[in-house]
Amino acid sequence: MASSGLEALPLLGSACDERDGAHLAEDLAIVEVIDRRTGRALGHGERGNLVVTVLEKDNFLLRYDLEDVVRLNENPCPCGETHRRLFYEGRVRDLVPAGDRAVLPIDVALVLYEFPEVSTPSAEYQIVRPAAPAAELHVRCEHAPGVDPTALAARIGDRLRDRLGVPARVELMPRGGLPRFAYKAARVVDA
């Protein structure tokens, strides 16, 4: 994320040359990351909802929940900027419940890109949101020709389980098996 904003606050944050998150414009807004269920403020590195209070008199917003899932980095930045850094991870609408966790597409993508068999030239995947609470994560993904899909699905499922802490069922299909989108890929689909 090079920069971020909203209509009432055009520049919420911007990245420095370190490219390690967006430094927040904390002199223009109060930025909080909260637990979406409890409303409790979260600390360094914890994932939660982005809530903003804009301090400008003409565009005042009080604890506006942008429904973005983010985390804050409160460690000093090598660039010398003193404001905290924000990392955008996804949208609340893309959270998929699996066991006692909520998984975002970025969580799955980071694992898939460890497997060239599914990520070259790019990973095409979907996370299936269950109609009822489920103990496992269901991921559909395309694979390159010439691989053993059963063995590869097991390896990816094991890695997802190890990284995300929930069992995963991986459904592999040949390239071209998932729909393509002109604008933004639908990474989360309902069962």
Please identify what each model-predicted range represents.
Residues 1-191:
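Active-site glycine/GP-rich loop and adjacent strand/helix microenvironment
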